[in-house]
Amino acid sequence: MRVAQVVRNTSETQISVKIDLDGTGRQKLATGVPFLDHMLDQIARHGLVDLDIEANGDTHIDDHHTVEDVGITLGQAVAKAVGDRKGIRRYGHSYVPLDEALSRVVIDFSGRPGLEFHVPFTRARIGTFDVDLSIEFFRGFVNHAGVTLHIDNLRGVNAHHQLETVFKAFGRALRMAVELDERAAGQIPSTKGSL
């Protein structure tokens, strides 16, 4: 079973993430940031991973620490659940549309953290959610999952649609990358022999 639980406590946030990479998309989310919960739901449902995430943070100041630290903790949990990366497909990609919006996400479980985030948001906030926090979420994720991640919103007018297509495509790309390839069972997907 490829499951993991990570608890991260700082003076700013207390976060618990449980993940099952071979799940069905079941989720239980309570981050204190409703729009973040909505986006995490997209990862679970479209990635077919089971996610239980609880967070208590200093949201009385703003949502920055909570969103970033959920990304960090989710990245740690994914890295732990994937383990030595033997037998995974390693690469994943997805294009997802939502009405006028279209996003592409490509992920590589390379062991080298890197983020290319290109989303020309049409407004600064979605409700009360600061769209800049999405960058902090994904930066935290890549740095702690050890992945290279390219995120491109190719078109969109509605900022909610833009970001929702990003999270849906991320879930689908994640699913593809961590999927076990029976033809490569027990093998590291790299000519170097390690990731």
From Swiss-Prot:
Q: Which reaction does it catalyse?
A: D-erythro-1-(imidazol-4-yl)glycerol 3-phosphate = 3-(imidazol-4-yl)-2-oxopropyl phosphate + H2O
InterPro entries in the cross-refs: IGPD_sf, ImidazoleglycerolP_deHydtase, ImidazoleglycerP_deHydtase_CS, Ribosomal_Su5_D2-typ_SF
| Enzyme Commission number | 4.2.1.19
Gene Ontology biological process:
L-histidine biosynthetic process
Tell me where it mainly resides: cytoplasm
Top-level taxon in the UniProt lineage? Bacteria
Intracellular or extracellular location(s): Cytoplasm
This protein's pathway reads:
Amino-acid biosynthesis; L-histidine biosynthesis; L-histidine from 5-phospho-alpha-D-ribose 1-diphosphate: step 6/9
Q: Which Pfam families is this protein grouped with?
A: IGPD
Q: Name one GO cellular component term.
A: cytoplasm
Q: Which GO terms describe its molecular function?
A: imidazoleglycerol-phosphate dehydratase activity
Q: Which NCBIfam families match?
A: PRK00951.1-1 (NF002106), PRK00951.1-5 (NF002109), PRK00951.2-1 (NF002111), PRK00951.2-4 (NF002114)
The entry sums up its family as follows:
Belongs to the imidazoleglycerol-phosphate dehydratase family.
In Swiss-Prot or TrEMBL terms, this protein is called Imidazoleglycerol-phosphate dehydratase
Instruction: Output the lineage of the source organism.
Output: Bacteria, Pseudomonadati, Pseudomonadota, Betaproteobacteria, Burkholderiales
